[in-house]
Amino acid sequence: SLPTDGAESPWGGAQLTFIARRSQTPDAPQNPQALLAFAAAHPGSVTYPRPPDFTGTAFLEQLLLTLTPQPDALRQPPEEATFAAVTAPLWHYLDRLHPLLWRQGRDFPASPARMDAMLKSGTLRLSITFNPLHAQQKAASGELPKDSYGFGFSEGMLGNVHFVAIPANARATAGAKVVANFLLSPQAQLRKADPTVWGDPSVLDPAKLTEKERQAFNAVVPQDIPPMLGEPHAAWVDALEQEWLRRYGTH
């Protein structure tokens, strides 16, 4: 994660989230070791999108954040001298996980959308998304089974915030600021957070809302969303993807 230094205005949140069906998985895995045990108990029904798909790479980052003994190293660009030591627990974990996956980890779905379809058809027991409200939104539209729900690891899941910015050469900066302010209003944030409308998470601090506004948000937003973990430095994305492809991409 990198600071925006006030150059952008936040307007929506995002977080890596697993999806399951309550009829199949009433007790979701709450940490990487539980996920490994779940995959062992249900071989062939778990997988993740093939990196460099954005969500597939985010899954690697999530595991690295929770498994590495050197999490502070992820706040800086990776260094050649320490990369192997920092990432060793991730590759050890994946070496154990892959034989338990769909097609024994020799093939991976191209996208989260493909995983959603495989969850709906019963091929998979888990899907994955970068929106904690995705399961609600897709269940409401009929694209996922009605009993689909989102979950994450109890210690937290990788997340970020998306922003709007006004170009330096914009011709109507005053009007653009009005729009940016409107997008941060409780009314707009609630509307877009509603899974039947969009399902894009709010960036508002609930403590700064009125009681009526908090109740309105609570009615549409799940209250069991796990804590948000900041993303590693952006340079880790390419480093992890290249190493993943070197290790597993030729299967």
Question: Language-model segments: which ranges?
Answer:
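Extracytoplasmic ligand-binding site segments that recognize negatively charged/polar headgroups
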Residues: 1-113
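Alpha-to-beta junction loops
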Residues: 42-45, 121-126
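Mature extracytoplasmic/periplasmic domains
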Residues: 157-158, 162-228
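Periplasmic-binding protein-like
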Residues: 14, 93-97, 108, 144-165
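Conserved C-terminal helix/tail region of periplasmic/extracytoplasmic solute-binding proteins
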Residues: 117, 222-251
